[in-house]
Amino acid sequence: MAQWQGLGRYPENADPKDCLAAGELLAYVDGSYQDALKKYGFGCIFILPDGRIYTEYGNGDNPDSLKQRNVSGEMLGAMYAVRFALNSGFRAIEIRYDYEGIEKWVTGAWKSKNELTQKYAQTMRGWGQKIQIRFTKVPAHSKVKYNELADETAKLGVANGNGIPKVKSLSDFEAADAAERMQDAAE
């Protein structure tokens, strides 16, 4: 059975990697929107138990999703993070977010009033049957290091993203790291 509780077990003044157990992933997610570009974007910061940090971003311009502006990016970021965790074999993910709907639509504390938020809540609840999803609200724009990085990454997603990327797994990032190390060694 899915657990929908914001445990908030990772104190902000602690190094997140020191608070993660094996098999757990911590993800900071955020969304952004630029009216001039007519695009929404998302940013994810993944922190692994061994201290490695990976980022991912993307954007979209679906007309129905544009109506939700940055909220579409917020939802995409949370969904991308859970899919990444599932693809990588994690048993649990904690999603840190600054927009309340990310948690409250899933838990039912807020009613999903449109098709987009209904699909988001339904999808996340389904995934919650496969992986433990925990939510922690962090204050927006309050100098929480990784939340600020997720915000910057979401803005990059709007401006520089090439659509919504295929959801990777940890092995994809590890392969890219190995290739980069080999290239650096060759230079």
Where does each model-flagged region fall?
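Glycine-rich, phosphate-binding/catalytic loops in enzymes
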Residues: 43-46, 111-113, 153
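RNase H-like nuclease fold core
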Residues: 2-72, 83-84
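Flexible, glycine- and charge-enriched loops at secondary-structure boundaries
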Residues: 67-71, 75, 113-117
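Short, motif-level signal for alpha-helix interfacial/capping segments enriched in acidic residues
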Residues: 3-12, 76, 119-121, 126
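RNase H catalytic domain
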Residues: 32-38, 79-149, 162, 167-170
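Noncatalytic linker/hinge segments flanking ATPase motor cores
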Residues: 66-72, 132-143, 174-184
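Acidic two-metal-ion nuclease catalytic site recognized across multiple nuclease folds
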Residues: 2-4, 163-187
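Stable alpha-helical structural segments in soluble proteins, enriched in small hydrophobic residues
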Residues: 73, 77, 81, 149-158
